[in-house]
């Protein structure tokens, strides 16, 4: 284990543009259950999963009704806004401050990376801490709208003050496309990176799970084109992909990742930070 942690630290220090991808596993130590694990939200409440799959269809047909259900119905995800970041989130902030991590792309909607202080953050599936205009994609804080008053006055759904588009929660529903701005910026980071640190994700939710595969494939294609005289290679011919997860994933089995450090992200990531500090002395 120690050798892999030191190896990860050296790989990070040798990289020029390292990014991190994070999933539900990094937040379980903050008391937030995952979705499909033994104690996951969908595992324990299959009806909640079925309702989640129908949610976006309801929004498209009747956004006012969708908002009423959000404001009056049970919160199937619990109050994620009360959760606090853990050692894993803070470790990524330390790596960013040390200059070895350039961006975090997360599929989590809990807002914990923002709370921890990550500066360059792309929330692939949105955040419970924000609302989003479905037309112009501007984000807002829920406190900017008096949602209860709008419901009492029969004025749901809320409207964007700039373009009058319909406002929904920023979280991406099943069947809803990833917001184009986030998708584009994520692809740009994947294209630029020479190291990808994948933390706490089983890599089975698409299109997020494609990002590591795209990082690997884009380098092969980029340098094949350069060798063929069809363009200049943008960076090194290989990208280092490191997993930190409680168990092997499809990325491990497919050989997409170079190696995996097995364990809790809240324990492993702080050790990587300490190793980075020791190497920099």
Q: What kind of region is each of these model predictions?
A:
Residues 1-281:
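Conserved catalytic core of sirtuin-type NAD+-dependent deacylases
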């Amino acid at each position: 284990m120690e050798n892999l942690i030191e190896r990860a630290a050296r790989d990070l220090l040798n990289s020029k543009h390292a990014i991190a991808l994070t999933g539900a596993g990094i937040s379980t130590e903050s008391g937030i259950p995952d979705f499909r694990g033994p104690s996951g939200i969908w595992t324990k409440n299959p009806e909640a999963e079925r309702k989640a799959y129908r949610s976006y269809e309801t929004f498209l047909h009747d956004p006012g009704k969708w908002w009423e259900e959000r404001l009056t119905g049970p919160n199937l995800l619990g109050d994620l806004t009360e959760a606090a970041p853990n050692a894993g989130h803070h470790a990524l902030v330390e790596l960013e401050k040390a200059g070895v991590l350039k961006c975090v792309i997360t599929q989590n909607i809990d807002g914990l990376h923002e709370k921890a202080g990550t500066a360059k953050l792309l929330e692939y599936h949105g955040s419970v801490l924000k609302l989003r205009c479905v037309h112009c994609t501007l984000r807002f804080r829920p406190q900017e709208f008096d949602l209860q008053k709008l419901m009492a006055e029969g004025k749901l759904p809320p409207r964007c003050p700039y373009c009058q588009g319909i406002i929904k929660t920023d979280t991406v529903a099943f069947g809803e496309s990833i917001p184009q701005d986030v998708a584009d910026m994520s692809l740009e980071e994947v294209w630029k990176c020479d190291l990808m640190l994948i933390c706490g994700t089983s890599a089975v939710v698409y299109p997020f799970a494609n990002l590591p595969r795209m990082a690997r494939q884009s380098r092969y294609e980029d340098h094949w084109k350069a060798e063929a005289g069809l363009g200049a290679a943008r960076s090194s011919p290989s990208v280092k992909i490191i997993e930190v997860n409680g168990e092997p994933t499809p990325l491990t089995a497919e050989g997409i990742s170079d190696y995996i450090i097995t364990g809790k992200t809240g324990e492993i990531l702080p050790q990587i930070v300490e190793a980075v500090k020791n190497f920099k002395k």
